[in-house]
């Protein structure tokens, strides 16, 4: 029997169960479903902004945008020697974006995309999928603005899937699968907005709000 066709709705059901898709490589057509024993998350009140990053944000001449070019952000995340984003996964995330369940936050130098992050939203959970940086600290800037936005929008869970040394240095932690599923259940019971009404994110305010909570 053929497995059911992979659709955006099926993908959202998987996220609600705490599993996510990955491919072995760009050229691997097979999709693997992952439910790690230990899960990386970002406590939304625990993002670490170093003094150097705070200075970078306050003085930066980059522009931060939201959902201006979702597909280009995903493409930039996949543009590396090894990637888990194959054509099927790319298509699914673009379709999720069209449905309002996937969003990107971009960092631009002029009109050039130099950093960014994208993820999936469901209830009050944000599932961070991937990020990239073509300038020093561009991905850190993207994360600072993203976490500020998630807090303002009422999100309670920022799932990073795995914990890397880079994410740990910024405040991400690792929790057990059972703890993660409990947090996910609570997050799915409510609603949040990635574009909260009246929200404004100028650099100085982002630094101040993150400093107050970390």
Swiss-Prot record:
EC numbers: 2.3.2.6
Catalyzed reactions per annotation: N-terminal L-lysyl-[protein] + L-leucyl-tRNA(Leu) = N-terminal L-leucyl-L-lysyl-[protein] + tRNA(Leu) + H(+); N-terminal L-arginyl-[protein] + L-leucyl-tRNA(Leu) = N-terminal L-leucyl-L-arginyl-[protein] + tRNA(Leu) + H(+); L-phenylalanyl-tRNA(Phe) + an N-terminal L-alpha-aminoacyl-[protein] = an N-terminal L-phenylalanyl-L-alpha-aminoacyl-[protein] + tRNA(Phe)
Localization terms from the record: Cytoplasm
Keyword Cell membrane carried by entry: no
GO cellular component: cytoplasm
A GO MF term: leucyl-tRNA--protein transferase activity
Keyword annotations from UniProtKB, A to Z: Acyltransferase, Cytoplasm, Transferase
Any one GO biological process: protein catabolic process
Broad EC category: transferase
Family in the record: Belongs to the L/F-transferase family.
Function of the protein: Functions in the N-end rule pathway of protein degradation where it conjugates Leu, Phe and, less efficiently, Met from aminoacyl-tRNAs to the N-termini of proteins containing an N-terminal arginine or lysine.
HAMAP family: Leu_Phe_trans
Protein name listed in UniProt: Leucyl/phenylalanyl-tRNA--protein transferase
Organism in which the protein naturally occurs: Cereibacter sphaeroides (strain ATCC 17029 / ATH 2.4.9)
Taxonomic path: Bacteria, Pseudomonadati, Pseudomonadota, Alphaproteobacteria, Rhodobacterales
Gene (name only): aat
């Amino acid at each position: 029997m053929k497995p059911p066709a992979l659709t955006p709705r099926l993908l959202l059901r998987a996220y609600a169960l705490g599993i996510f898709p990955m491919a072995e490589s760009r050229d691997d057509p097979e999709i693997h479903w992952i439910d790690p024993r230990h899960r990386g998350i970002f406590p939304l009140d625990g993002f670490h902004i170093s003094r150097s990053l705070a200075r970078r944000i306050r003085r930066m001449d980059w522009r931060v945008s939201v959902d201006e070019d979702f597909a280009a952000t995903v493409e930039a995340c996949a543009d590396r020697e090894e990637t888990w984003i194959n054509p099927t996964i790319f298509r699914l995330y673009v379709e999720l974006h069209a449905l309002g369940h996937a969003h990107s936050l971009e960092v631009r130098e002029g009109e050039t995309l130099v950093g960014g992050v994208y993820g999936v939203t469901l209830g009050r959970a944000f599932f961070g999928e991937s990020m990239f940086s073509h300038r020093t600290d561009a991905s850190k800037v993207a994360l600072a603005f993203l976490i500020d936005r998630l807090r303002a929008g009422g999100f309670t869970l920022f799932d990073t899937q795995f914990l890397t040394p880079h994410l740990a240095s910024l405040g991400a932690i690792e929790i057990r699968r059972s703890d993660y599923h409990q947090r996910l259940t609570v997050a799915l019971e409510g609603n949040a907005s990635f574009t909260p009404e009246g929200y404004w994110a100028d650099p100085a305010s982002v630094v101040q709000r993150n400093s107050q909570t970390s």
